[in-house]
Amino acid sequence: MTDWSRRRFLQTGAALGIAGTLPQTTTEVSAASPTLEKFVQPLPIPSVREPDGQRDGADAYEIAVTEFTQQLHPDLPETTVWGFDGSYPGPTIEADAGSPVHVRFDNSGLPSEHLFPVDDRLGGTTAENHPGYDGPVPEVRTVTHFHGLELDPANDGQSDMWTSPGGVEGPRFDSAWQELPMEQGRTTSTYHDHTLGITRLNAYAGLLGLYSITTDAERELGLPSGDYDIPLLLQDKEFNDDGSLHYPEEFVSAFLGDTAVVNGAVWPYVEVEPRRYRFRILNGANHRSFDLQLESESGSGVPTMYQFAPGHGFLESVVPIGPNGDLDSLLLTPFERGELVVDFSDHAGETLTLANGADMGPELTDLVEFRVSDPSTPPEDASADPTSLSLPTPASYDESDARVTREMTLGTEVRNGLITHTLNGHVFGDEDAPVYPQLGATEIWELQNESGGRHPIHLHLVTFRVIGRGPDGTQPPDPNELGPKDTVRVDPGERVRILVTFEGYTGQFPWHCHMLEHEDNKMMIPFVVENPVADYANEENVVDATGLTDAVGDWRNETLETEVLLEVIDQWRSGDEVA
């Protein structure tokens, strides 16, 4: 066992310790799903969505959000789900970097009654949970967030920007169209529901899909493509005997299903050739972490998984994962991603399983079966050897660039019989946004987890670099964390340090735990990005001579940083409106 593996084992064990400490009402206890035979249906691949046309020079998509039935296993009756364009998961949206996309999600086809019971004890389910809003809060509401996209607030799909099938609009709803500039590096991620108080229900019902942004640098790597580029969207669910999805009637803080669902199919198999494949793996579960490794049916050796990206950009170097790798397994908390190349060349005729070693709740060890063909002639494979990939150099970063270091202590307390999450001793959401980063500023956030369970922390708007973890935050990140990320695992008793630059847009953005039950139970709070240059703009939002004089005066009085003064000067010289 490598040093990384020992640390991973201890982290996993600590994260699971919460099960023995929480009140009985916080975990899901139910009758098991019907017994279903594994690996009797092929893995479905989500279709790639073609644009419906153009809108203001952007590819335009009009996507219906509806309720329908879908066969998730041959031995189950059809299951009622929600989805995008009549499919669960939704179709994949692909874009080139710099090519804008506009999307309109139309939920008018959803029923007025939710697929699952809505617990109105949770914030967001009644009007009193929406400050400054006294309108109706329908049971069925949706809003779609493109996880990991750099967007202005109006297009970010934030939790109080929902709409209902009957046309009721949430307090911060802005437009039916979401305008996505796609002006960022290569990305593999998900679009998913993000509605205040019912995200866990809407996502569990099926409201998520994949999107990707491709760059020329990615194409030049020679990664497996076409039929050899396979997405794996991992989830866990429970079923009733009639095929319907089971979810608890009252809120539980940790839902763990007993059945693996991958790309909308229960325990599927994949027929692969003895050659290299690319896998884009997303943990789309409500709460469950997946600790992934390959296992051989015969007990023989397994191919190494070579991770080259964590969802954004690229890692500093390719990380081999497996018995002889730098890591024994790939640990993904909810909504983390891992992008891999696996070479099946030496395993013709064998059967392999993607297995889960994270021992959480109902045992869920097997996920997907790979059946490697044994052709008489080896298949052609022009893709690059993953051991010799020359990855683009990630953007440099330096801790000394940080203007501010912020302590973010995560804890819990019990209120009204519910586990409630706290930030620096205050219940999430009981106060206004505690942080106001300046546009362009780099900060260090120290995430100290004093609660009893794991938290995958996600920041909207930005990507960040993990710079330390462990009990005091001084241990190096895992090798497959050395790249741009938008979600980071913070285990109990651990301090995780991230370096983040707030750039692109000003305004209000949420950061939250991405365990959906935690998120719905108020473990979400905004940060507000402010542009200090705006303080020196006139009524036309332009820095004039008066504003420049004021800025110089503040700098001389040592109340304005030199960096901000230089930005004010540049803004005055340009004559442009302040962003």
UniProtKB/Swiss-Prot annotation:
For this UniProt entry, the molecular function terms from Gene Ontology, in alphabetical order, are: copper ion binding; hydroquinone:oxygen oxidoreductase activity
Q: What is this protein called?
A: Laccase
How does activity shift as pH rises or falls?
Optimum pH is 6.0 for the oxidation of 2,2'-azino-di-(3-ethylbenzothiazoline)-6-sulfonic acid and 8.4 for the oxidation of syringaldazine.
- Cell location: Secreted
Q: Which residues form the signal peptide?
A: 1-31
Organism in which the protein naturally occurs = Haloferax volcanii (strain ATCC 29605 / DSM 3757 / JCM 8879 / NBRC 14742 / NCIMB 2012 / VKM B-1768 / DS2) (Halobacterium volcanii)
For this protein, the record's InterPro entries field holds: Cu-oxidase-like_N, Cu-oxidase_C, Cu-oxidase_fam, Cupredoxin, TAT_signal
One GO term describing the cellular component: extracellular region
Q: Which gene encodes it?
A: lccA
Keywords, in A-Z order: Copper, Glycoprotein, Metal-binding, Oxidoreductase, Plasmid, Repeat, Secreted, Signal
The answer to whether the entry has keyword Repeat is yes
- Function per UniProt: Catalyzes the oxidation of a wide variety of organic substrates, including bilirubin, syringaldazine (SGZ), 2,2'-azino-di-(3-ethylbenzothiazoline)-6-sulfonic acid (ABTS) and dimethoxyphenol (DMP). No oxidation of Fe(2+) or guaiacol.
